[in-house]
């Protein structure tokens, strides 16, 4: 039987492998679309609360990207009409960003495109196994989100 430390290392290795396998799958799927995985990831962030506007600096923080990187993706999405950029009334350098109806539809169409592969990935899981996996991943996601700066060894 593995020790807790051995299990923690193994789970971390498995997450690395899963991340690579899922990234490869996503890249193959996105090759057929007019939007990139980075654009989709950012656009999906807006779908959680479509009426909220965001500043680039806020997005950079929550998406854990540098400001030039997020600005590039935002510009691409604005150019495609998927985000709307409205200048700040007190500081014209700042732009308030909101998802457009076209952006919401693009997210929905993209998720529909992914649905067959998503179902394929989890087809070998019983409903209770999938529910348990979801609960455990939610717990891990919440911990990682809450403890973004609590990195031991730095």
Where are these regions (language model features)?
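Recognition helices and adjacent regulatory flanks at domain boundaries
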Residues: 1-2, 8-9, 19-21, 58, ...
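N-terminal leader segment of winged-helix/HTH proteins
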Residues: 1-33, 80
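Charged, amphipathic alpha-helical coiled-coil/dimerization segments
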Residues: 23, 75-135
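Alpha-helical linker/hinge and terminal dimerization helices associated
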Residues: 15-18, 22, 63, 106, ...
């Amino acid at each position: 039987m593995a020790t807790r430390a051995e299990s923690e290392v193994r789970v971390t290795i498995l997450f690395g492998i899963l991340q690579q396998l899922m990234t490869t799958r996503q890249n193959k799927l996105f090759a057929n679309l007019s939007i990139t995985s980075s654009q989709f990831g950012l656009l999906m962030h807006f779908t959680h609360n479509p009426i909220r506007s965001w500043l680039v600096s806020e997005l950079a923080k929550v998406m854990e990207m540098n400001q030039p990187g997020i600005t590039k993706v935002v510009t691409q999405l604005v150019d495609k009409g998927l985000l709307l950029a409205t200048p700040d009334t007190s500081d014209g350098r700042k732009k308030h960003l909101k998802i457009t109806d076209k952006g919401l539809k693009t997210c929905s169409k993209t998720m529909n495109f992914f649905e067959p592969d998503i179902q394929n990935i989890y087809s070998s899981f019983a409903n209770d196994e999938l529910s348990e996996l979801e609960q455990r991943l939610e717990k891990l996601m919440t911990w990682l989100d809450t403890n973004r700066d609590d990195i031991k060894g730095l």
